[in-house]
């Protein structure tokens, strides 16, 4: 399946289609969208965002605990969309504050 991903970035909103087996960060790069990242393995907070709407599967990640994920935190480098989704990006400072 393919889902609509809307990213709310400091530079404005970006929308694209993302297959359910492609990480959101990878697909964003394919679309020419510049997002922050570091490890690309779900073990740091550089790419952190907040899911505002919809669902993701980020079971490949290890940095976030269950409580953070329940609050909507997402690591875009290990997140697959499982529905149409809206994500606020560039949230590392807020997450680690």
From Swiss-Prot:
[2Fe-2S] cluster binds at residues 39, 44, 47, 77. It is found in: Plastid, Chloroplast. Pfam families: Fer2 (PF00111). Residues 3-93 form the 2Fe-2S ferredoxin-type domain. Its cofactor is [2Fe-2S] cluster. SUPFAM superfamilies: 2Fe-2S ferredoxin-like. Gene3D superfamilies: 3.10.20.30. PROSITE patterns: 2FE2S_FER_1, 2FE2S_FER_2. One of its GO terms (molecular function) is 2 iron, 2 sulfur cluster binding. Binds 1 [2Fe-2S] cluster. One of its GO terms (cellular component) is chloroplast stroma. One of its GO terms (biological process) is electron transport chain. Keywords: 2Fe-2S, Chloroplast, Electron transport, Iron, Iron-sulfur, Metal-binding, Plastid, Transport. PANTHER family: FERREDOXIN, FERREDOXIN-2, CHLOROPLASTIC. Belongs to the 2Fe2S plant-type ferredoxin family. Ferredoxins are iron-sulfur proteins that transfer electrons in a wide variety of metabolic reactions. This is Ferredoxin-A.
């Amino acid at each position: 399946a393919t889902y609509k991903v809307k990213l709310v970035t400091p530079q404005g909103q970006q929308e694209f289609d993302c297959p359910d087996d492609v990480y959101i960060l990878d697909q964003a790069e394919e679309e020419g969208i510049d997002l922050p990242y570091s490890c690309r393995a779900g073990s740091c907070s550089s790419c952190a965002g907040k899911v505002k709407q919809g669902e993701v599967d980020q079971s490949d990640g290890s940095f976030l605990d269950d409580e953070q994920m329940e609050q909507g935190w997402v690591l875009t480098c290990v997140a697959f969309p499982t529905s149409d989704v809206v994500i606020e990006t560039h949230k590392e400072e807020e997450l680690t504050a």
